[in-house]
C-alpha cells in the first residue's frame, strides 16, 4: 500500500496539509480546480530558474492568496520588486480576483524532495551521468539532516535502447508509517533520447503528538548484560577441546582405546 500510493495523498489530514485550501459548491468546484492547475503550470514555466519547491493556493472571500516556496526568493522578486508586481498582475488577470503573493524561503534546498528532483533532471539534460547525479544528491541530503532518502530514475538511462528503472536508497524511508514526515517530489528530464522521470522520497523524522515521546535507542555500552550462570557451574562438554563429552576420546572411543565389540 505505502509503496505504491502517493506519499502526500496517503498522509493528508494526518501529517500533511492540502496544497489548495478553499471551499466551493458542486457547480464551482471543477472550474476552480482547473484554474488552480493552470496557475501552477504557469508558475512552473515562469519561475523555472527560481527553484520553486511548492505553491500553496488559498481563496478567502473573493480573494486569492498564493504562497510560493523558493530557495531563491530574490529571483522571484526581481530588481526593486518589479518581477513580483508583473507576476501579481498576470495572476489577477488569469484568476479574475485580487491576488496577494507571498514568498517563503526554503532554507535547506538539499533536503527538499521537489528541488532535489528538479536538480537531477537539470543535470540529466546537461548529459551528466545519472548515477553520479543521484549519489551526489543523496550525500548532500544525508549530510544536512535527512534521516533517509530514496531516488528512482526511469527511462532510457544513458541512451540505452530498452528503458529501465534504477533506484538508490540511504538511511530509512518508512513509507507505511503515517506519522513519518515523508517529502515527495517528481520531475521529468527532456533528453534527446526521450523523457526520463525522477522520483524522490525524503524522510525527515516523525510527527509526534502531544502525548508521544520520541523513541531514543539506548547506547550499546549502557545496555544491561544478561545475568549469567552462577560461578562454578558449567554445561556438560564445556571446557573440553572440541566440545567432547566425558569419557569420549579421539574417534569417539573410550579412554581405554579398546573396541567394545571386538575386544581389540
From Swiss-Prot:
BP GO annotations: translation
Gly residues biased stretches: 240-255
Compositional bias segments (type: Basic and acidic residues): 221-239
Region described as Disordered: 211-264
Tagged with keyword Ribonucleoprotein: yes
Keyword match Ribosomal protein: yes
GO CC entries: cytosolic small ribosomal subunit
Function: Binds the lower part of the 30S subunit head. Binds mRNA in the 70S ribosome, positioning it for translation.
Name the record gives this protein: Small ribosomal subunit protein uS3
Organism: Ralstonia nicotianae (strain ATCC BAA-1114 / GMI1000) (Ralstonia solanacearum)
Gene encoding the protein: rpsC
